[in-house]
């Protein structure tokens, strides 16, 4: 089966259009396709409960109740990006075999339990701390990207002078800059390991197309670095958008209503197809028609 990854904008539209989960999933299955739900999608819906605005909270409640229909159909949930990176690193070093990019049954049930707690208004302190930490991570990622470029003027010059066609070629190449960026992610997840040993892991991960999350993470960082170098900065929510793209790294089609999001996916995830819908399009019909005819589909680099 091939998997579709819809970003949060797609699930919002499906909810507002009252798309029937059973009918849609059945129709996709006839085409050997199925949804994969990104953990980042659920995160963005759940954070509505932490705004302090009742209207936004109600919106989050509506969305999560809608998503529960898909969870009752056992639509797979992609593991968090950090978990994918850890499992790929353990696999490439022969420490532990990577079983799946999807949450197992126990982890799946944990998600459902946490959603039910939110819907009942049960919000534990550690949950609040998690959302605060995630917001800080996005801000740190954006600042770290700019700091990395400022610390490497040579790299900044190379990226800043590269055309869009040239950056596409750069993303296909296992270069030291990419390994350095991946090393930063690995050091965060394996703080007790030496930078030297993790540098070897980064090199191994980027040498094999098997490790799709590591490669997507690196390519996304390089692409954002290029945009930062050519434009001087990147918009505040762009690093958060890349969480979706990396989450889709083991999927076959990335679906969104945002052209810029699709552009990032095409640059970051090798071989992925993208579908971009207008805000007023019927998503269910559009999905089935586009996939059946192959229209409006672009393939990754």
Describe each region flagged by the PLM:
Residues 2-250, 260-301:
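Active-site-proximal, substrate-binding regions of enzyme catalytic domains
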Residues 257:
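Conserved residues at the C-terminal ends of beta-strands
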């Amino acid at each position: 089966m091939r998997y579709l990854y819809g970003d949060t904008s797609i699930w919002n539209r499906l909810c507002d259009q009252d798309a029937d989960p059973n009918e849609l999933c059945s129709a996709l299955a006839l085409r050997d396709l199925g949804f994969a739900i990104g953990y980042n999608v659920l995160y963005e819906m759940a954070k509505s409960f932490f705004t302090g605005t009742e209207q936004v909270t109600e919106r989050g409640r509506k969305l999560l109740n809608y998503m529960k229909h898909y969870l009752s159909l056992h639509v797979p949930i992609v593991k968090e990006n950090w978990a994918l990176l850890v499992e790929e690193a353990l696999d490439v070093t022969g420490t532990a075999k990577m079983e799946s990019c999807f949450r197992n049954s126990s982890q799946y049930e944990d998600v459902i339990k946490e959603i039910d707690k939110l819907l009942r208004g049960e919000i534990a302190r550690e949950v609040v701390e998690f959302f605060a930490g995630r917001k800080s991570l996005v801000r740190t990622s954006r600042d770290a990207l700019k700091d990395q470029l400022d610390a490497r003027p040579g790299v900044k010059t190379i990226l800043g002078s590269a055309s869009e066609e040239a950056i596409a070629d750069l993303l296909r190449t296992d270069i030291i800059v990419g390994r350095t960026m991946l090393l930063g992610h690995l050091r965060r997840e394996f703080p007790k390991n030496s930078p030297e040993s993790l540098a070897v892991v980064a090199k191994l991960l980027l040498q094999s197309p098997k490790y799709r999350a590591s490669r997507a993470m690196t390519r996304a960082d390089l692409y954002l670095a290029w945009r930062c170098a050519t434009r001087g900065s990147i918009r505040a929510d762009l690093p958060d958008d890349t969480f979706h793209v990396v989450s889709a790294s083991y999927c076959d089609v990335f679906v969104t209503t945002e052209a810029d999001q699709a552009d990032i996916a095409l640059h970051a995830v090798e071989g992925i197809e993208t579908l971009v819908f207008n805000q007023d399009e019927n998503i269910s019909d559009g999905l089935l028609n586009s996939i059946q005819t192959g229209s409006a589909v672009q393939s990754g680099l």
